[in-house]
């Protein structure tokens, strides 16, 4: 800690580091799923949902969730997290548009993104749930169904 002026400076550095790392990990994981020169298939949609599940099981995601929990009772940490959360949300949605070209013009893109994000985050923090992987597969199937429905409804001509 001797490299930092205070505990809050350490926490701000950790939050900032995880912010950049999480965005980069997401970009790397999702970058080759949706090819703009091919038709979007259910398999590609499912792969994106499965990859989102992998993402919320990465050590960086888990560490960040711990910080979010701690920020509930630590005002200085909450301040650092709030700032990063706003930026993360903007950057995350930009990344979604960049790595999923078929979804760029989908009217319900934000709703689809939020569905995946909140469901996967919820499953991610339920790491002690019995039969976690079997339950995750069922939820992945359901989320894939919804995303396919949203995509087909919003792109039907």
What are these regions (language model features)?
Residues 1-14:
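Helix-turn-helix
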Residues 10, 87-91, 119:
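A short structural micro-motif
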Residues 13-16, 20, 24-59, 112-116:
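Hydrophobic alpha-helical connector segments
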Residues 14, 18, 22, 26, ...:
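Hydrophobic recognition helices of helix-based DNA-binding modules
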Residues 23, 27, 54-65, 75-102, ...:
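Amphipathic alpha-helical packing segments from all-alpha helical-bundle domains
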Residues 72:
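Acidic, metal/ion-handling microdomains and their immediate structural contexts
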Residues 78, 82, 99-157:
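Hydrophobic/aromatic-rich alpha-helical bundle segments in the mid-to-C-terminal region
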